[in-house]
């Protein structure tokens, strides 16, 4: 049975001189790091546009890309900018945290200049093909963003009522008035696409696959909610009638109120789940594997009345279940999906996951609270993906230092037989590497032995999330050696790396044999 591993690091966390990670040289360097350490996967968070709060799970579109990730140096190479266009610009000077306000403010005029140069100089054949191939999602998105900017970035439900309800004459007038802004959004999506596809092509050539991430829900402030309200449970004015969240539990007395609109599954089923099939089809153009967030919501979901301030008054409502995934498989074949099956689990959710055949997830840091937890590695199953933690959790060291009580720490040390010289992070990484799961994914923070100062997200909080960045000197030879040793010891080497290593050994053995034979021949000649 094949065993593999990879690393979770979002694009925003790559080192960069532009205040936030990008599709530039650091991304290519990271692919090289993965390749030389025998990894098979690079897992990232959603690539979608981010809104207030900067969460990649709350996007203006289920399809459009985050233009923060467009690398400006690559635009120079393409001829659409010069380095002077951004020399001296302050994108945020902290090497370990993103300043989203500065990134948003400073990048826009630079990208506008690149767009103008592109439109003036470029051979637009590839661009026109991009527009044609992506028209179904691209044109509505560009229209939405242009009108949104016209109304000072307010969400669609705070626009003029005629624009909110898509009065035809109003929309035609706005499109004419905002033609240049629509064009800007088309072109920057093209820039995003060509840079990402080039990076993905490079990764795939190195036998590295990309694991992408798909939020189950769209944001209320999204083009989908504005353009296709019939796909959601709404009132007559197209506002959500119910919203998503999680019920109260031992950790949150009020539950979690996410506020996302909830799908009208009857309407989606009526057209054969066409929207979901299109969404996944487009996702597999971006990624090799897709992790679907909140997978249990397809079996049943927590539905909360719109306007409530907590999740207490919600109720469980049945979702489409396996019927959706049968329709997807019929159209797209055996797609590679990871089911994020964490949280409140029932036998019905487990049965749905098992029927699809998708691997679920295991989080090792959850396993040390006492008893024979399902999150302890000896209880994992092969068809699973194991983590120390994800973007929503503490780092391994952070968990040990800040959350684990003394009993949990003692249990962890005994369970992992951790010696005094082994770091907490390495012991946890060793735990998932040794597990039976077919895939182990390490977070970059855990590989670097970082604490909660490097945590990516604290759910249900705002203001200090999604900011962590890796230092430019983090990918050391020592780190590469440690990860390669871990990967080799627990038989998780990328098959391509293993084959290349074996081929190199054969070459070296052949060279050695030839050298020996030559030396023997020389000795025989001199006798």
Please provide the spans of the model-predicted regions.
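Surface-exposed amphipathic alpha-helices with a cationic face
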Residues: 35, 196-206, 329, 353-354
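Long, low-complexity, intrinsically disordered segments
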Residues: 509-527
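Alpha-amylase-like alpha-glycosidases and glucanotransferases acting on alpha-linked glucans and related
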Residues: 10, 16, 54-189, 218-441, ...
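Conserved, well-ordered alpha-helix/loop/beta-strand core segments that scaffold catalytic motifs
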Residues: 185-218
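Catalytic domains of carbohydrate-active enzymes, especially glycoside hydrolases
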Residues: 26-50, 286-287
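Short alpha-helical segments and helix-capping/turn motifs at coil-helix boundaries
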Residues: 25-32, 194-202, 276-278, 424-428, ...
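N-terminal regions that are enriched for targeting/export leaders
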Residues: 1-12, 28
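Structured C-terminal cap/extension of enzyme domains
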Residues: 449-502, 508-514
């Amino acid at each position: 049975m094949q065993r593999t591993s990879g690393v979770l690091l979002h694009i925003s966390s790559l080192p960069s001189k532009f205040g936030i990670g990008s599709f530039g040289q650091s991304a290519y360097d990271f692919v090289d790091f993965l390749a030389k350490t025998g990894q098979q996967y690079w897992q990232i968070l959603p690539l979608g546009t981010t809104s207030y709060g900067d969460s990649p799970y709350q996007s203006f579109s289920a399809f459009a890309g985050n233009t923060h990730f467009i690398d400006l140096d690559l635009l120079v190479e393409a001829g659409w900018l010069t380095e002077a266009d951004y020399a001296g610009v302050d994108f945020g000077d902290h090497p370990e945290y993103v300043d989203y306000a500065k990134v948003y403010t400073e990048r826009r005029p630079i990208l506008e200049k690149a767009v103008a140069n592109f439109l003036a100089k470029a051979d637009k054949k590839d661009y026109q093909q991009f527009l044609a191939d992506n028209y179904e999602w691209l044109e509505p998105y560009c229209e939405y963003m242009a009108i949104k900017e016209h109304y000072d970035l307010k969400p669609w439900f705070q626009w003029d009522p005629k624009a909110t309800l898509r009065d035809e004459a109003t929309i035609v007038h706005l499109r004419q008035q905002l033609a240049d802004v629509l064009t800007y959004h088309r072109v920057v999506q093209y820039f995003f696409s060509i840079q990402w596809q080039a990076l993905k092509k490079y990764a795939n050539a190195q036998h590295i696959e990309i694991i992408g991430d798909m939020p189950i829900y769209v944001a209320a402030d999204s083009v989908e909610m504005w353009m296709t309200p019939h796909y959601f449970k709404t009132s007559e004015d197209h506002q959500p009638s119910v919203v998503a969240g999680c019920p109260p539990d031992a950790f949150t007395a009020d539950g979690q109120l996410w506020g996302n609109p909830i799908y009208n599954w009857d309407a989606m089923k009526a057209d054969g789940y066409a929207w979901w099939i299109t969404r996944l089809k487009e996702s597999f153009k971006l990624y090799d594997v897709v992790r679907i967030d909140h997978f249990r919501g397809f079996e049943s979901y927590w539905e909360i009345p719109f306007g409530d301030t907590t999740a207490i008054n919600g109720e469980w409502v049945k979702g489409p279940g396996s019927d959706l995934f049968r329709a997807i498989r019929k159209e797209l074949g055996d797609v590679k999906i990871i089911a994020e099956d964490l949280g409140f689990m029932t036998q019905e959710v487990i049965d749905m996951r098992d029927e699809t055949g998708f691997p679920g997830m295991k989080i090792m840091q959850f396993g040390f609270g006492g008893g024979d937890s399902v999150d302890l590695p000896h209880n994992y199953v092969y068809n699973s993906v194991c983590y120390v933690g994800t973007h929503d959790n503490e780092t391994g060291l952070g968990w040990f230092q800040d959350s684990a009580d003394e009993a949990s720490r003692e249990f962890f040390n005994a369970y992992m037989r951790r010696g005094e010289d082994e770091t907490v992070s390495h012991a946890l990484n060793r735990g998932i590497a040794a597990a039976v799961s077919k895939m182990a994914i390490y977070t970059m923070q855990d590989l670097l032995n970082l604490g909660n100062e490097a945590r990516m997200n604290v759910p249900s909080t705002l203001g200090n999330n999604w900011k962590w960045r890796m230092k430019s000197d983090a990918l050391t030879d020592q780190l590469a050696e440690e990860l390669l040793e871990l990967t080799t010891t627990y038989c998780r080497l990328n098959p391509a790396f293993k084959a290349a290593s074996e081929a190199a050994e054969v070459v070296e053995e052949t060279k050695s044999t030839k050298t020996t034979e030559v030396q023997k021949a020389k000795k025989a000649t001199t006798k």
